[in-house]
């Protein structure tokens, strides 16, 4: 199961290499927490880190039932994140900007929870990669790894990132160097005896004689490992040539810090053999599987190279994702900045800062990998539960969203810090999801009922005023009838006056005309 998860992680990483978008493209399209391609790689890294937790629980004294329940809970968390993506018809419907359009602070809070989750997973991936290197390399090899990586990074900075095609070709060549170095290391570093679990991280003696094959293999391994993690720095560059050069320098500087601090983590891990506990040694079960004698040496070398490359690639993808989330889901809603250049600076600065924090956390050789993986995956549970509620179109208010995110994140951190609850692993996903969903559901229903009561209260006065309204309507109708009657009366009076005037005029006209007798008398006078 663990090896299958590692192989799946490696395959997802290579698919991500060919299909990734630049940071500027993500900012233009609105890609943040929910719909970026790097999110798939992050969840795949969760699968690999999840494989460490059941083995730690079982070897630490937990029963098989607890181990199985923890594994099932972890798989359920991943499916809870993946299923809404599969159900969605188009990626645009998954953006956090649309999901959290009601409240910009809820959007920023969701981004902050996801940034913490990615930071924890990144530190766990880097710590795991450092322990893989410490289990395979000798002391001088670990130092040679840092020197070779630094040299290759200087060459990368001088060449610059002029085009994506050139970086792809360089990455393919460096990946081939990793495979070649793995085969060389299989013949030199892997012994014929099985490595005991308790002595897996024990310091190895430095070789007295350094052959040219050893130095060549160290250089090839360092160049190959840096080449695989050099892909994410391409995502830190914008499309313009000037921004690409600037983003390339920032990315390569972050990769140089990654390589040097990973080498330092390997050295500290070897120097801290006396402080290693049984649970810390038990968490190296994955390393023992790829370095045990029962596997052929070439296959063991390929698995070691694949595991290291996949972990470093996932760490780089998660750093890029942190930058995108910080710019799109935190800085944009809080500041209202919509210009591309400030958002790009915020994204690159957040990616570099998260890289430094993750490297510092990964330097602790006594920190169990379970702490990193458990905290990161439980915080991812909070994010997945929140987004699942939004995908299901729950009626929630900003207060419920804030309380759900706060309680879920507090439960995740507390579950990972308390030793008694930490033993149960990913079973903590259940209370974290419930504490995230219940405030949204309860407060959403409370606000809905409150709105319904307010609506009913506004309707009640209208019902009591119905008789008065009817009386007012009747009075208005009576006034209208009275006004019409008055108008008709006025019209009849006016017609009567007109008739009287006409009759008077006719009478005057008749009086003014002479009669027939007067006409005859006048004729006789003539």
Region locations from a protein language model:
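A generic transmembrane alpha-helix motif of multi-pass inner-membrane proteins
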Residues: 1-14, 398-455, 459, 522-526
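Hydrophobic alpha-helical segments and their helix-loop junctions in multi-pass secondary transporters
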Residues: 11-20, 122-126, 130-143, 147, ...
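Loop-to-transmembrane helix boundary motifs in multi-pass membrane proteins
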Residues: 102-109, 118-119, 324-366, 370
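Selective recognition of specific alpha-helical transmembrane segments in multi-pass small-molecule
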Residues: 8, 78, 113-124, 155, ...
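Hydrophobic, small-residue-rich membrane helices and short re-entrant helix-turn-helix hairpins
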Residues: 93-101, 159-169, 227-260, 278, ...
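Helix-loop-helix module between adjacent transmembrane segments
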Residues: 66-157, 220-221, 308-317
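Membrane-interface "cap" regions at the ends of multi-pass membrane proteins
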Residues: 1-52, 156-159, 172, 178, ...
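Membrane-interface helix-loop-helix modules in multi-pass membrane proteins
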Residues: 27-92, 220-224, 233, 241-275, ...
């Amino acid at each position: 199961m663990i090896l299958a998860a590692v192989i799946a992680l490696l395959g997802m990483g290579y698919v991500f290499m060919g299909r990734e978008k630049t940071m500027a493209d993500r900012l233009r399209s609105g890609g943040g927490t929910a719909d970026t391609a790097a999110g798939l790689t992050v969840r795949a890294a969760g699968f690999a880190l999840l494989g460490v937790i059941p083995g730690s629980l079982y070897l630490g004294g937990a029963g098989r039932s607890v181990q199985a329940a923890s594994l099932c809970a972890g798989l359920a968390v991943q499916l809870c994140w993946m299923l809404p993506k599969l159900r969605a018809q188009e990626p645009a419907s998954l953006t956090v900007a649309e999901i959290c359009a009601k409240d910009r602070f809820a959007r920023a809070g969701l981004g902050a929870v996801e940034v913490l989750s990615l930071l924890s997973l990144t530190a766990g991936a880097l710590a795991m990669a450092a322990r893989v290197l410490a289990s395979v390399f000798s002391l001088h090899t670990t130092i040679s790894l840092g020197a070779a990586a630094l040299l290759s990074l200087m060459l990368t900075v001088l060449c610059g990132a002029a085009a994506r095609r050139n970086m792809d070709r360089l990455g393919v060549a460096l990946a081939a160097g990793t495979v070649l170095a793995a085969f060389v290391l299989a013949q030199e570093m892997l012994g014929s005896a099985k490595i005991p679990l308790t002595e897996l991280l024990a310091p190895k003696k430095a070789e007295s004689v350094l052959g040219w094959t050893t130095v060549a293999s160290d250089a090839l391994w360092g160049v190959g490992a840096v080449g695989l993690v050099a892909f994410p720095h391409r995502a830190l560059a914008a499309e313009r040539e000037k921004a690409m050069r600037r983003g390339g320098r920032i990315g390569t500087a972050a990769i140089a810090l990654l390589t040097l601090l990973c080498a330092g983590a390997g050295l500290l891990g070897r120097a801290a053999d006396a402080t290693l506990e049984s649970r810390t040694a038990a968490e190296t079960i994955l390393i023992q599987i790829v370095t045990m004698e029962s596997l052929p040496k070439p296959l063991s070398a390929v698995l070691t190279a694949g595991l290291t490359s996949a972990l470093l690639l996932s760490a780089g993808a998660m750093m890029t994702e942190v930058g995108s989330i910080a710019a799109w889901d935190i800085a944009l809603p809080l500041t209202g900045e919509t210009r591309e250049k400030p958002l790009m600076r915020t994204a690159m600065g957040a990616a570099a800062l998260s890289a430094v924090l993750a490297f510092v956390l990964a330097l602790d050789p006594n920190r169990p990998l379970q702490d990193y993986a458990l905290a990161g995956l439980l915080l991812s549970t909070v994010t997945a539960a929140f987004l699942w509620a939004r995908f299901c179109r729950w009626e929630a208010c900003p207060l419920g969203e804030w309380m759900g995110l706060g309680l879920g994140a507090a439960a995740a951190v507390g579950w990972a810090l308390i030793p008694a609850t930490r033993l149960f692993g990913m079973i903590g996903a259940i209370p974290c999801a419930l504490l995230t969903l219940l405030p949204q559901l309860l407060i959403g229903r409370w606000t809905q009922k409150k709105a319904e009561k307010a609506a009913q209260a506004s309707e009640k006065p209208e019902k009591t005023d119905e008789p008065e309204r009817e009386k007012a309507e009747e009075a208005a109708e009576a006034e209208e009838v009275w006004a019409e009657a008055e108008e008709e009366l006025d019209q009849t009076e006016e017609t009567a006056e007109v008739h009287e005037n006409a009759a008077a005029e006719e009478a005057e006209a008749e009086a003014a005309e002479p009669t027939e007798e007067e006409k005859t008398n006048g004729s006789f006078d003539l």
